[in-house]
Amino acid sequence: MIKKFKLPKNWRTQLIIEEYRYSRKELEYRLKLKDKDIGYLSVLKKGKYFFVKVVSVIPEMRGKGCGSMLYEHAINQLGRLSTNYHAASSLAQRVWIRLIKKYEHTDEFFTGILTVYKKKD
């Protein structure tokens, strides 16, 4: 029998994002609730770009804003975040569409690279 994950009432205030740096070019942000991994976002630096490699959120936490929280944390930490938009899944594209409404962005049409920038204070 699979044990269902139960959320505490104030779960959003208990979330922690930890950074793991694997090299100068590769890092990961992990979203945790207490000791449970909720999701992660992996980034690879290529030249001036910080490309999202993988984003994953456990099924029980999908649709609750956890993925968006990881994207926004990465943007705020790195200053910008990029994707090859046409290679992104339809779910990821929906997140990117929400991000471009909130952040400055550039779209390099011929390369298919979409970059979202942290707003200047």
Question: Which residues does each PLM region occupy?
Answer:
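Conserved active-site tyrosine of GNAT-family acetyltransferases
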Residues: 96, 100
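Conserved acetyl-CoA-binding loop-helix of GNAT-fold acetyltransferases
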Residues: 57, 63-76
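C-terminal "cap" of GNAT-fold acetyltransferases
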Residues: 108-121
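Conserved acetyl-CoA binding element of GNAT-fold acetyltransferases
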Residues: 48-59, 84
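Conserved beta-hairpin
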Residues: 16-20, 24-39
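Conserved GNAT acetyl-CoA-binding A-motif
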Residues: 49, 76-91
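Conserved donor-binding loop and adjoining core beta-sheet/short helix segment
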Residues: 33-53
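Conserved N-terminal entry element of GNAT/NAT acetyltransferase domains
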Residues: 1-19
